Swiss-Prot record:
It comes from the Bacteria. One of its GO terms (molecular function) is Ser(Gly)-tRNA(Ala) hydrolase activity. Its main location: cytoplasm. This is D-aminoacyl-tRNA deacylase.
Amino acid sequence: MIALIQRVTRASVTVEDEVTGEIGPGLLVLLGVQKEDDEQKANRLCERVLGYRIFSDADGKMNLNVQQAGGSVLVVSQFTLAADTERGMRPSFSGGAAPDRAQALYEYFVERCRQQAINTQTGRFAADMQVELVNDGPVTFWLQV
């Protein structure tokens, strides 16, 4: 399971001209689910994402996680993160989880975030989405379990 996380001042996702999720300061999480992923990996990745200290403390050091910083989370499914790009000029998506399994793990990940009392917004699984964000820093990290 892969999360591309970005520290943002604001972010939103729109599907068919409808805003389905919107946050102020916090994390935009682009989530990719791979074939071998399961609930245990989703738990570990959620723990890492929410615990990752990429927000500045009073001294300006990256020392706070999203909850300590009072931020929110916007989770957007992105199967392209599971692509194999090592050969050729076209990505292969054979490493991605089957759609039903990927959706179940995506929804499980979102629910785990919500259980941590963090405002968690979402896109719509498998939809054509427009994501708008203001990356703060810029600060972007690739987390994989």
